[in-house]
Amino acid sequence: MKENKIKVIINKSIDEIFEFTTNPKNTHLWIESIDEEVAEKYPPEVGTEYKNRDKDYNWDFYKVLEFVNNNKFTLSDLDDDYHVKYSYVSLGSNKTEMEYYEWVNKGELEKPFTQDVLDKLKAVIESNE
């Protein structure tokens, strides 16, 4: 699989969803394979580097390609091969659709996200009052 696109509807405002999913302090709460994520700066801007660590202390590094508040957040690995784009659409004051789209330029996706990951994101955010 070279690309993967999944969506989730979350019963929270677009502001809350965008802030939660772009803030590195929250990543480990909804992506089980990540133990820690840090960014050079937050909120990020184009060119900001993020890095995340798995349970075996392996670090992966990414750079921000697009950052449009409450609209889209796109990153790539430093080799510019793996990309991920989060897109956000408001469906009302307390309902947001988020699309997660990941792709590679060469080869196949190693560990594509599943709907379970976005379902966990939904559960975590909706329980966060």
What are these regions (language model features)?
Residues E3-K7, E49, W59, K72, ...:
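Intrinsic-disorder/low-complexity, polar/charged segments enriched in Ser/Thr/Lys/Arg/Asp/Glu/Gln
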Residues T74-N128:
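Beta-strand/loop substructures that line and gate deep hydrophobic ligand-binding cavities in soluble
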Residues V38-D80, D116:
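Glycine-rich portal/gate segments that line the openings of hydrophobic small-molecule binding cavities
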Residues M1-A39:
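Hydrophobic ligand-binding cavity/cleft-lining segments
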Residues K7-N11, K51, K63, S87-V89:
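Generic structural detector for well-ordered beta-strands
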Residues I17-T21, T27, N52, V64, ...:
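Hydrophobic pocket/interface hotspot
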